[in-house]
């Protein structure tokens, strides 16, 4: 009986752990974020970030792994922001990580993503070799894979030359909290505040981002006379 009770308690504990969400607050952090030139997922052409940001008011760079359930939840909101504010000087660019380019293309099609997407790595084995990983260590992101990870850039404040674009900016070490981020975006674009909306996702339960994780199956012990 004690063994069965212990198993029940352990299952409850696992449920709590795996029911966490990975939303995080928008915070200004010191980070030496570097300029980059990566290949486009869609056509393999080079995209340089400094050139991409030029002439815009605000750019969201979102790093993601296509297999990550947490990215599944953020992708529609990132697309919504892009569509809603691109005419106001806002843009989004995704940086794919830890999977094949083919898998990234499929993911973009499935999620109906239309903003620009490049890739830094193509394998999960590259995890600790990426700039994405280095940036997360700098900003205190302790998650296993860090997908999604978001950084906002204000092009008028970026350095015009050199490897480093900025040394201080706003980041989100997790999923975007929709109401907070949209308020931030509107402020940076010089748009009036919208009426307060109920948080659509602040308390929702989502999956933790871990690749190929299979739940442990427990068998009920047989009772013998």
For the regions a language model picked out, list residue spans one by one.
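Positively charged n-region of N-terminal signal peptides that target proteins for export
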Residues: 1-5
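Non-globular targeting/processing and membrane-anchoring segments
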Residues: 20-39, 173-225
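A short beta-strand-turn-helix
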Residues: 35-59
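Conserved redox-active cysteine motifs that mediate thiol-disulfide chemistry
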Residues: 63-80
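Conserved segment of the thioredoxin-like fold in thiol-based oxidoreductases
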Residues: 83-130
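Thiol/disulfide oxidoreductase modules built on the thioredoxin-like
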Residues: 111-113, 122-184
């Amino acid at each position: 009986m004690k063994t069965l009770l212990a198993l029940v308690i352990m299952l409850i504990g696992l449920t709590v752990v795996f029911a966490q969400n990975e939303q995080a607050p928008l915070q200004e952090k010191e980070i030496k974020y570097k300029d980059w030139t990566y290949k486009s997922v869609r056509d393999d052409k080079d995209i340089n970030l400094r050139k991409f940001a030029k002439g815009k008011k605000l750019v969201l760079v979102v790093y993601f792994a296509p297999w990550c359930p947490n990215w599944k939840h953020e992708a529609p909101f990132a697309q919504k922001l892009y569509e809603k504010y691109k005419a106001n000087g806002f843009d989004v660019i995704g940086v794919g990580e830890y999977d094949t380019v083919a898998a990234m293309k499929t993911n973009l099609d499935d999620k109906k993503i239309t903003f620009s997407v490049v890739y830094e790595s193509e394998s999960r084995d590259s995890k600790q070799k990426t700039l994405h990983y280095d940036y997360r260590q700098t900003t205190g992101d302790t998650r296993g894979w860090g997908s999604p990870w978001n950084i906002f850039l204000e092009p008028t404040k970026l350095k015009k030359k050199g490897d480093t674009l900025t040394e201080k900016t706003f980041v989100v070490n997790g999923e975007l909290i929709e109401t907070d981020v949209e308020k931030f975006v509107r402020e940076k674009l010089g748009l009036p505040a919208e009426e307060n909306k109920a948080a659509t996702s602040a308390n929702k339960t989502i999956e933790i981002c871990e690749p190929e994780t299979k739940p442990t199956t427990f068998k009920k012990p047989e009772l013998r006379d």
